[in-house]
Amino acid sequence: MAYPGKKSKSYETPRHPWQEARMAAEVQLVKAYGLRNKKEVWKAASMLRMYRSEARKLLAQVASGGQEGELEGHYATQSEEILSKLIRYGIIKADANVDDILSLKTENILERRLQTQVLRLGLARTVIQARQFITHGHIAINGRKATIPGMLVSKEDEMHIGYYGSSPLMSESHSERPVQVASFLADSATTLKAAAEAKQARERPPERGGGRKKRGGRR
């Protein structure tokens, strides 16, 4: 138990710190979503792990419930609360069920961060610039300044994200305001990770066949 007033760690570190595949995937997420470090990836992964753990417990209750396969009592209430929260934040669709929680990935959580939404709404040119605008107090939700890039944004609040009233960015002639939104940002079905992978594939130089032949032995 932590001391009163002392913040406890809100994430779990990887059990095996030197797994090459996991480390490469974390670096890819850090770059795609403009994260400060891997701790922000671990926070999202820990949140997802919590929801998936609750979903497994609920599905176990469904399996042990007999032929009806329906949750009753506080299990049904718990299921409704989890689903309604995930739907409210746009992490799952409105018609999703408990099974759909198990198919979620870390990027589904990262997509709902304020930093990601500022980029998708065309308020910043890059994901790094989106983070800068937020931390410098240029972004507001419902007119209130928001300075935490990692806060999760609900679907309702998403409609009210904009520049803060006294920010210089309120001027349409400001040089740092983006002119237009990229096409992949307007498509919410395409995650920033998928867009980054597609861009990397396009920029990768084609492999040349053959190569210079080695000369024969010494004369």
Swiss-Prot record:
Question: Its domain of life?
Answer: Archaea
Region Disordered, as annotated, extends over 193-219
Keyword terms: Ribonucleoprotein, Ribosomal protein, RNA-binding, rRNA-binding
Q: Name one GO biological process term.
A: translation
Please give the coiled-coil regions recorded for this protein: none
GO cellular component assignments: small ribosomal subunit
- Output compositional bias ranges, type Basic and acidic residues: 199-210
According to the entry, every stretch annotated as the S4 RNA-binding domain falls at 112-174
GO molecular function (one): structural constituent of ribosome
Which Pfam families is this protein grouped with? S4 (PF01479)
Q: Does the keyword Signal apply?
A: no
List the InterPro entries. Ribosomal_uS4, Ribosomal_uS4_arc, Ribosomal_uS4_CS, Ribosomal_uS4_euk/arc, Ribosomal_uS4_N, S4_RNA-bd, S4_RNA-bd_sf
* UniProt key word Metal-binding: no
The annotated subunit structure for this chain is: Part of the 30S ribosomal subunit. Contacts protein S5. The interaction surface between S4 and S5 is involved in control of translational fidelity.
Which PANTHER family is this protein grouped with? 30S 40S RIBOSOMAL PROTEIN (PTHR11831), 40S RIBOSOMAL PROTEIN S9 (PTHR11831:SF5)
So what does this one do?
One of the primary rRNA binding proteins, it binds directly to 16S rRNA where it nucleates assembly of the body of the 30S subunit. With S5 and S12 plays an important role in translational accuracy.
Q: Which family does it belong to?
A: Belongs to the universal ribosomal protein uS4 family.
Name the record gives this protein: Small ribosomal subunit protein uS4
Q: Which organism is it from?
A: Methanosarcina mazei (strain ATCC BAA-159 / DSM 3647 / Goe1 / Go1 / JCM 11833 / OCM 88) (Methanosarcina frisia)
